[in-house]
Amino acid sequence: MKDGFITVATATPQVAVADCEANAQAILACINEMAAAHAKVMVLPELCITGYTCSDLFWQTKLLDEAEAALSVIAEGSRQVDALIAVGMPLRVAGKLLNVAAILCRGKVLGFVPKVNLPAYNEFYETRHFTSGSADMGTVQFGGEEIPVGTNLLFSCENVVDLCVAAEICEDLWVPNPPSVQHALAGASVICNLSASDEMVGKGSYRRDLVAGQSARLVCAYLYATAGEGESTTDLVFGGQNLIAENGTVLAESATFENETNVATIDVQRLVSERRRMSTFPAAESKEYREISFALAEEETKLARFFDADPFVPSNADQLSDRCEEILNIQALGLKKRLAHTHAKSAVVGISGGLDSTLALLVTARAFDMLGLPRKGIVAVTMPGFGTTDRTYNNAVAMIKSLGATFKEVPIAKAVMQHFADIDHDASIHDVTYENSQARERTQILMDIANQANGFVIGTGDLSELALGWATYNGDHMSMYAVNASVPKTLVRHLVRHYADTSADEVLAGVLYDVLDTPVSPELLPPEDGAISQKTEDLVGPYELHDFFLYQMLRMCFPPAKIYRVAKEAFAGRYSNETILKWLRTFYWRFFSQQFKRSCLPDGPKVGSVAVSPRGDLRMPSDACVSAWIKEVETLQP
């Protein structure tokens, strides 16, 4: 349960209609199976102690007596199970019959949550047997104790501060204002839905979307367990489609028409953090609720969930293609607006033959096409210097010509050498002055050409470089519109590959594929034997690690220890723990120390959920101390 990770489960027992004794044993078997998976919150279907399809048998006192006796058996049989358990049953309260979720923990019944919305349309006749529940229905005596009854029950874990559980039943989810809305607003981070939803053609996908959507709206984990095989098939069939969703993502789903157990790991710390970040999610207000405490044994949750090593990149090929097209359009539309607003006659792009400048040129070409402007208005400038290789230079020239942009070449070596003489710098000393002088010379050239051409300079730097501060202040850091500013390096590759894969120009596609195969480098140091000598990832670390760290820090707000924990899962077999720790420390140090560069970024379009614009997503002081984060990293063990 460390870091907010909780194993949860849903299960559908094989019920025997109206045989509560048999059903109690089937339910206990499911509970034991979920316990073997270390589940700490368990959900079983609506009315599963009796079977949902008992119909007029619900009027029989014998059945109701048997149901209550069965609950006692389940409570006693689960006394050693370290979990909060929700199980469905009929319950007599104040002379009426309620359809309730019985909530148990370690053999004790903690509360009964009644169903509010009783369907009486189409195949459903629940109002024939049951009464709608309300917020506070007092207590009912069960097992010699007074047990609270009502929809206003919150079950809060004493030793996992962010684990707060509430329940609703089946139809409650399908109405315009589900009880789960108020539960979430009162602080519930986990919603249990005990359901008996019959199958019809197309209903499964709708149900899936409903559960996922509710978990997204409420920023919660939603555990949905529904009736399955064993229910009466007199008129209906129940498919047992169990679902576990978290903030819009389905983490686990059982096969329909199979009575299966679903297990997933949810992250309640992340959910509460996300709510805290959202100014439109109200502060928890639970004064109308009764809070019931329970405790769970402390143990570290085995992470039974997928952590994507490339969080910015969809793993599904079709989704990736659509996402790439969408991002390219966002970038191009942002630039289109700026071109139209400024009445610019041209756009100036410095082309190195590397990934970032390639993407910037492709986006600029698309923006010009959207405006119906000739691509000759794109002034693509190559500025070979001390570190330029034939490979990158030739690729730059070839792509400029293939795209129909205006080619311009301005070698920088002579100007930089003059600059070294002016400032009395020894050109044989390849230090930061040697490197940054080249970057600033290139920026000056681009700015002046933009003035000549009545245009503006297109920035090429990407999100990963900005996060690490891997840019020369007032050099490549500066432009007049930065189209790549919120595109991480791992995604830049996919955007360029997508453009190549879909291009009708075979020559251009070939150049783009070669750019993709070229090592990432600023090419500010002289080559060795004609090959790139300065490789960025050798200096600052693998971009796939840094992009992962960036996503987990800014999007998820995870602390260093949690990022390290999930990084080990995501990169298992690819990077050693020592390597992950080394570059995690580098990431934090660079992220904090380089904020001054991000505090004065040019405009640029946001394309994803993570961005570092000082006017938008990241309001961070340039002189913040990183010591707390570094200290935590240094306590971590490989």
Predicted regions and their residues:
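Enzyme catalytic cores with a strong preference for nitrogen-chemistry domains
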Residues: 1-350, 366-375, 407
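ATP/NTP-dependent adenylation/nucleotidyl-transfer catalytic domains that generate, transfer
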Residues: 23, 161, 220, 232, ...
